[in-house]
A protein has these predicted regions:
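Auxiliary, metal-adjacent structural segments of Zn-dependent hydrolase domains
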Residues: 91-151
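Metalloprotease/metallohydrolase-associated module, dominated by Zn2+-dependent proteases
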Residues: 202-293
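C-terminal motif of bacterial Sec signal peptides marking the signal peptidase cleavage site
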Residues: 12-15
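Active-site recognition of the HExxH zinc-binding catalytic motif
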Residues: 150-200
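Structured domain cores in non-transmembrane regions
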Residues: 127-172, 270-273, 277-290
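Structural recognition of the beta-strand scaffold that forms the well-ordered cores
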Residues: 119-120, 153-157, 242-246
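Acidic/polar, low-complexity intrinsically disordered N-terminal segments immediately downstream
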Residues: 17-108, 251-293
Protein backbone atom coordinates (compact mmCIF):
# COMPACT_ATOMS: atom_id res chain seq x y z
CA UNK A 1 0.00 0.00 0.00
CA UNK A 2 1.41 3.35 -0.97
CA UNK A 3 1.02 6.11 1.59
CA UNK A 4 1.16 9.62 0.23
CA UNK A 5 2.64 12.11 2.62
CA UNK A 6 2.24 15.81 2.10
CA UNK A 7 5.12 17.17 4.14
CA UNK A 8 3.89 20.75 4.05
CA UNK A 9 0.54 19.54 5.30
CA UNK A 10 2.30 17.59 8.03
CA UNK A 11 4.17 20.69 9.10
CA UNK A 12 0.98 22.74 9.10
CA UNK A 13 -0.81 20.10 11.12
CA UNK A 14 2.12 19.17 13.34
CA UNK A 15 0.19 20.11 16.42
CA UNK A 16 -2.63 17.73 15.52
CA UNK A 17 -2.99 14.19 16.76
CA UNK A 18 -1.07 11.52 14.92
CA UNK A 19 -4.20 9.65 13.97
CA UNK A 20 -5.18 12.49 11.62
CA UNK A 21 -5.46 11.18 8.07
CA UNK A 22 -2.35 13.02 6.96
CA UNK A 23 -1.86 10.65 4.05
CA UNK A 24 -5.11 11.82 2.44
CA UNK A 25 -3.97 15.45 2.24
CA UNK A 26 -2.29 16.37 -1.03
CA UNK A 27 -0.16 19.47 -1.54
CA UNK A 28 0.96 19.78 -5.19
CA UNK A 29 4.72 19.90 -5.60
CA UNK A 30 5.44 18.92 -1.99
CA UNK A 31 4.55 15.25 -1.77
CA UNK A 32 6.66 12.56 -0.14
CA UNK A 33 5.75 8.97 -0.80
CA UNK A 34 6.11 6.00 1.49
CA UNK A 35 7.68 3.73 0.53
CA UNK A 36 10.39 5.96 -0.89
CA UNK A 37 11.64 3.16 -3.13
CA UNK A 38 15.36 3.23 -2.41
CA UNK A 39 15.63 -0.15 -0.70
CA UNK A 40 12.88 -2.76 -0.38
CA UNK A 41 13.91 -4.10 3.03
CA UNK A 42 14.28 -0.62 4.51
CA UNK A 43 10.95 0.46 3.03
CA UNK A 44 9.18 -2.52 4.56
CA UNK A 45 10.59 -1.66 7.99
CA UNK A 46 9.66 2.01 7.61
CA UNK A 47 6.06 1.16 6.71
CA UNK A 48 5.87 -1.05 9.81
CA UNK A 49 7.24 1.78 11.96
CA UNK A 50 4.64 4.13 10.49
CA UNK A 51 1.88 1.66 11.31
CA UNK A 52 3.23 1.22 14.84
CA UNK A 53 4.05 4.79 15.84
CA UNK A 54 2.45 7.08 13.27
CA UNK A 55 5.78 8.77 12.50
CA UNK A 56 7.36 9.22 9.08
CA UNK A 57 10.90 7.85 8.81
CA UNK A 58 12.44 9.53 5.76
CA UNK A 59 15.82 8.91 4.15
CA UNK A 60 15.20 11.17 1.17
CA UNK A 61 14.33 14.77 2.00
CA UNK A 62 15.45 18.30 1.21
CA UNK A 63 17.71 20.68 3.08
CA UNK A 64 14.71 22.97 3.45
CA UNK A 65 12.78 20.25 5.25
CA UNK A 66 15.81 19.48 7.43
CA UNK A 67 15.95 23.09 8.63
CA UNK A 68 12.22 23.83 8.72
CA UNK A 69 10.74 24.91 12.04
CA UNK A 70 7.55 26.59 13.16
CA UNK A 71 9.34 28.17 16.12
CA UNK A 72 11.49 31.15 15.14
CA UNK A 73 15.04 31.15 16.50
CA UNK A 74 14.57 27.65 17.94
CA UNK A 75 18.09 26.81 16.78
CA UNK A 76 19.57 29.94 18.31
CA UNK A 77 22.92 30.58 16.67
CA UNK A 78 23.48 26.91 15.88
CA UNK A 79 23.92 25.87 12.25
CA UNK A 80 23.54 22.24 11.20
CA UNK A 81 24.06 20.35 7.97
CA UNK A 82 23.63 16.73 6.90
CA UNK A 83 24.91 14.18 4.42
CA UNK A 84 22.24 11.91 2.92
CA UNK A 85 22.32 8.22 3.72
CA UNK A 86 22.48 5.55 1.04
CA UNK A 87 19.17 3.66 1.08
CA UNK A 88 20.96 0.32 1.39
CA UNK A 89 22.33 1.46 4.77
CA UNK A 90 18.95 2.39 6.22
CA UNK A 91 18.05 -1.08 7.51
CA UNK A 92 21.22 -1.24 9.59
CA UNK A 93 20.48 2.18 11.07
CA UNK A 94 16.94 1.08 11.90
CA UNK A 95 18.37 -2.00 13.64
CA UNK A 96 20.54 0.32 15.73
CA UNK A 97 17.61 2.59 16.58
CA UNK A 98 15.58 -0.41 17.70
CA UNK A 99 18.40 -1.52 20.00
CA UNK A 100 19.37 1.85 21.44
CA UNK A 101 16.07 3.77 21.35
CA UNK A 102 12.73 2.05 20.78
CA UNK A 103 13.39 -0.98 22.99
CA UNK A 104 13.43 1.20 26.12
CA UNK A 105 9.91 2.60 25.79
CA UNK A 106 6.36 1.32 25.65
CA UNK A 107 4.75 1.42 22.22
CA UNK A 108 1.97 3.65 23.51
CA UNK A 109 4.43 6.21 24.86
CA UNK A 110 6.44 6.33 21.63
CA UNK A 111 3.29 6.68 19.55
CA UNK A 112 2.61 9.82 21.55
CA UNK A 113 6.16 11.09 22.02
CA UNK A 114 7.99 10.44 18.75
CA UNK A 115 8.17 13.44 16.42
CA UNK A 116 6.14 13.38 13.23
CA UNK A 117 9.26 13.38 11.05
CA UNK A 118 12.39 11.33 11.70
CA UNK A 119 15.13 12.11 9.20
CA UNK A 120 17.65 9.31 8.65
CA UNK A 121 21.03 10.65 7.54
CA UNK A 122 24.59 9.51 7.02
CA UNK A 123 25.93 12.34 9.16
CA UNK A 124 24.51 15.30 11.03
CA UNK A 125 27.04 18.03 11.74
CA UNK A 126 27.09 21.15 13.90
CA UNK A 127 29.00 24.21 12.75
CA UNK A 128 31.71 25.19 15.23
CA UNK A 129 33.01 28.77 15.35
CA UNK A 130 36.39 29.32 17.00
CA UNK A 131 37.98 32.75 17.19
CA UNK A 132 41.55 32.90 15.88
CA UNK A 133 43.43 35.77 17.51
CA UNK A 134 46.15 35.54 14.88
CA UNK A 135 43.86 36.46 12.00
CA UNK A 136 41.32 38.25 14.20
CA UNK A 137 38.42 36.30 12.76
CA UNK A 138 36.39 33.16 13.32
CA UNK A 139 37.45 29.82 11.85
CA UNK A 140 34.52 27.60 10.93
CA UNK A 141 34.56 23.81 11.11
CA UNK A 142 32.03 21.00 11.36
CA UNK A 143 31.53 18.60 14.26
CA UNK A 144 29.73 15.28 13.90
CA UNK A 145 26.74 14.88 16.23
CA UNK A 146 24.54 11.88 16.86
CA UNK A 147 21.23 13.68 16.45
CA UNK A 148 19.56 17.06 16.30
CA UNK A 149 15.97 18.01 17.02
CA UNK A 150 13.60 20.78 16.02
CA UNK A 151 9.90 21.04 16.76
CA UNK A 152 8.26 17.78 15.73
CA UNK A 153 11.33 16.41 13.94
CA UNK A 154 14.61 14.76 14.75
CA UNK A 155 17.54 14.03 12.43
CA UNK A 156 19.76 11.06 13.24
CA UNK A 157 23.26 10.11 12.14
CA UNK A 158 24.27 6.69 10.86
CA UNK A 159 27.26 4.64 12.00
CA UNK A 160 30.06 3.46 9.74
CA UNK A 161 29.73 -0.23 10.54
CA UNK A 162 27.07 -2.87 11.01
CA UNK A 163 25.40 -3.18 14.40
CA UNK A 164 26.89 -6.66 14.75
CA UNK A 165 30.39 -5.23 14.33
CA UNK A 166 29.96 -2.40 16.84
CA UNK A 167 31.70 -2.77 20.17
CA UNK A 168 29.77 -2.66 23.43
CA UNK A 169 31.18 0.79 24.15
CA UNK A 170 30.23 2.11 20.70
CA UNK A 171 26.64 0.95 21.22
CA UNK A 172 26.55 2.49 24.68
CA UNK A 173 27.91 5.84 23.48
CA UNK A 174 25.41 5.93 20.62
CA UNK A 175 22.55 5.02 22.97
CA UNK A 176 23.50 7.66 25.53
CA UNK A 177 23.83 10.48 23.03
CA UNK A 178 20.68 9.63 21.08
CA UNK A 179 18.62 9.19 24.24
CA UNK A 180 19.78 12.53 25.64
CA UNK A 181 18.77 14.36 22.45
CA UNK A 182 15.41 12.60 22.37
CA UNK A 183 14.65 13.39 26.01
CA UNK A 184 15.76 17.00 25.60
CA UNK A 185 13.34 17.31 22.69
CA UNK A 186 10.57 16.02 24.93
CA UNK A 187 11.42 18.65 27.54
CA UNK A 188 11.38 21.35 24.85
CA UNK A 189 7.93 20.25 23.68
CA UNK A 190 6.66 19.86 27.27
CA UNK A 191 5.94 16.19 26.60
CA UNK A 192 8.02 15.57 29.73
CA UNK A 193 7.88 18.04 32.60
CA UNK A 194 9.62 17.99 35.96
CA UNK A 195 7.47 17.51 39.06
CA UNK A 196 7.07 20.46 41.39
CA UNK A 197 8.93 18.60 44.13
CA UNK A 198 12.01 18.37 41.91
CA UNK A 199 11.95 22.06 41.00
CA UNK A 200 11.39 23.17 44.60
CA UNK A 201 14.65 21.71 45.91
CA UNK A 202 17.21 23.93 44.16
CA UNK A 203 17.44 27.71 44.17
CA UNK A 204 17.73 28.93 40.58
CA UNK A 205 18.29 32.52 41.63
CA UNK A 206 21.72 31.93 43.19
CA UNK A 207 24.71 31.25 40.98
CA UNK A 208 27.32 28.73 42.05
CA UNK A 209 31.06 29.16 41.61
CA UNK A 210 32.44 25.63 41.31
CA UNK A 211 31.58 21.95 41.06
CA UNK A 212 31.39 21.42 44.81
CA UNK A 213 28.92 24.27 45.23
CA UNK A 214 26.91 22.95 42.30
CA UNK A 215 26.54 19.49 43.86
CA UNK A 216 25.71 20.92 47.28
CA UNK A 217 23.00 23.00 45.59
CA UNK A 218 21.58 19.89 43.89
CA UNK A 219 22.92 20.43 40.36
CA UNK A 220 24.67 17.74 38.32
CA UNK A 221 26.91 17.83 35.28
CA UNK A 222 25.29 17.53 31.88
CA UNK A 223 27.51 14.94 30.15
CA UNK A 224 26.69 16.36 26.71
CA UNK A 225 28.57 19.53 27.68
CA UNK A 226 32.28 19.99 28.34
CA UNK A 227 31.74 22.42 31.20
CA UNK A 228 29.75 22.73 34.42
CA UNK A 229 26.56 24.32 33.09
CA UNK A 230 25.30 25.53 36.47
CA UNK A 231 28.29 27.84 37.05
CA UNK A 232 27.84 29.42 33.63
CA UNK A 233 24.89 31.62 34.57
CA UNK A 234 22.27 29.33 32.97
CA UNK A 235 20.26 28.52 36.06
CA UNK A 236 16.93 27.46 34.59
CA UNK A 237 14.52 24.68 35.42
CA UNK A 238 14.79 23.19 31.92
CA UNK A 239 18.60 23.16 31.99
CA UNK A 240 18.46 21.45 35.37
CA UNK A 241 16.01 18.81 34.14
CA UNK A 242 18.01 18.22 30.95
CA UNK A 243 21.21 17.74 32.97
CA UNK A 244 19.58 15.09 35.14
CA UNK A 245 17.99 13.31 32.18
CA UNK A 246 21.26 13.25 30.25
CA UNK A 247 23.16 12.04 33.30
CA UNK A 248 20.60 9.31 33.89
CA UNK A 249 20.92 7.88 30.38
CA UNK A 250 24.71 8.30 30.26
CA UNK A 251 25.55 6.84 33.67
CA UNK A 252 25.10 3.50 35.37
CA UNK A 253 23.95 3.27 38.99
CA UNK A 254 27.58 2.63 39.95
CA UNK A 255 28.68 5.81 38.19
CA UNK A 256 26.08 7.80 40.14
CA UNK A 257 27.44 6.79 43.55
CA UNK A 258 29.68 9.81 44.15
CA UNK A 259 27.04 12.39 43.21
CA UNK A 260 24.40 10.65 45.30
CA UNK A 261 26.44 11.40 48.42
CA UNK A 262 25.15 14.98 48.13
CA UNK A 263 21.75 15.16 49.89
CA UNK A 264 20.03 17.51 47.44
CA UNK A 265 21.25 15.54 44.43
CA UNK A 266 19.97 12.33 46.04
CA UNK A 267 16.56 13.89 46.72
CA UNK A 268 16.18 15.16 43.16
CA UNK A 269 17.45 11.89 41.69
CA UNK A 270 14.93 9.82 43.65
CA UNK A 271 12.04 12.16 42.85
CA UNK A 272 12.78 12.27 39.13
CA UNK A 273 13.40 8.53 38.71
CA UNK A 274 10.11 7.74 40.46
CA UNK A 275 8.21 10.42 38.53
CA UNK A 276 9.41 9.22 35.14
CA UNK A 277 8.37 5.66 35.97
CA UNK A 278 4.92 6.47 37.36
CA UNK A 279 3.97 9.36 35.06
CA UNK A 280 5.47 8.21 31.75
CA UNK A 281 6.32 4.54 32.19
CA UNK A 282 10.02 5.27 31.60
CA UNK A 283 12.55 3.15 33.47
CA UNK A 284 15.37 5.63 33.00
CA UNK A 285 17.73 3.80 35.36
CA UNK A 286 17.47 0.78 33.06
CA UNK A 287 18.51 2.95 30.11
CA UNK A 288 21.61 4.14 31.94
CA UNK A 289 22.45 0.69 33.28
CA UNK A 290 22.25 -1.04 29.90
CA UNK A 291 25.69 -2.27 28.91
CA UNK A 292 25.86 -4.12 25.62
CA UNK A 293 27.86 -7.18 24.72
Amino acid sequence: MRIYISLLAILFLSGCAKDTQIGNIQVPGADYVLPQGGDAMADQRILKLYETYGSYFLYEFSEKDFNWTQISNSLGDDVFRFDPIEPVKVKNLLDLLQLTWFDFYDQEFLAHALPIRIFLTETVQLQVRKFDWGIWDYILSWKDVYARYLDNQIAISNVNKSVADMSAEEKRVYKSNLQSVFLESLVASATIVAPDEFIAISDYSNNVDDTEEARNAGFVLNPTMDYEWSIDGNMTESNDLNAYLASLVFRTAKEWEDDLQYPLVKQKYDILVSWLKTEYGIDIVKIGNTIYE
